């Protein structure tokens, strides 16, 4: 298992809508993420910067790189494009975050 984190940016004033949409996440999208090896996916919000900080655990043999080819993933990104920063194809703009500390890794 591997943990990764990344940052995205939510448009100002869209926190409640972002939370509402995720509270009603499509079951077929949940299945696609699970089938790709994604586990324990969490997203945090910084109200001062409008940044979203995502963290997830994935299997070592994950297939996350195939998610952008799935219709359900593309439709979800289209659905979310009006409330967050995205590329022209509606892929969310993401900045990978580097780990700098992990308490469990201490001996």
UniProtKB/Swiss-Prot annotation:
Locations listed in the record: Cytoplasm
Cross-referenced InterPro entries: Dimeric_a/b-barrel, L-rhamnose_mutarotase, Rham/fucose_mutarotase
Sequence positions that bind substrate: 18, 41, 76-77
Record field: catalytic activity: alpha-L-rhamnose = beta-L-rhamnose
Pathway(s): Carbohydrate metabolism; L-rhamnose metabolism
Main EC class the enzyme belongs to: isomerase
Gene3D superfamilies: 3.30.70.100
Pfam families listed in its UniProt record: rhaM
Record keyword Ion transport present: no
Active-site residues annotated for this sequence: 22 (proton donor)
Keyword Transmembrane carried by entry: no
Assigned EC number: 5.1.3.32
Family: Belongs to the rhamnose mutarotase family.
Summary of the function given for this chain in its UniProt record: Involved in the anomeric conversion of L-rhamnose.
Assembly description: Homodimer.
UniProt-recorded name of the protein: L-rhamnose mutarotase
Annotated source species: Paraburkholderia xenovorans (strain LB400)
Organism ancestry: Bacteria, Pseudomonadati, Pseudomonadota, Betaproteobacteria, Burkholderiales
Gene designation: rhaM
């Amino acid at each position: 298992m591997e943990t990764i984190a990344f940052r995205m940016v939510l448009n100002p004033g869209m926190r409640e809508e972002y939370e509402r949409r995720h509270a009603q996440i499509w079951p077929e999208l949940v299945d696609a993420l699970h089938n790709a090896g994604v586990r324990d996916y969490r997203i945090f919000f910084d109200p001062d910067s409008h940044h979203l900080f995502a963290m997830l655990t994935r299997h070592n043999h994950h297939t996350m790189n195939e998610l952008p080819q799935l219709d359900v993933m593309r439709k979800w990104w289209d659905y979310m494009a009006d409330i967050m920063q995205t590329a022209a194809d509606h892929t969310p703009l993401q900045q990978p975050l580097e780990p700098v500390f992990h308490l469990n890794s201490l001996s």
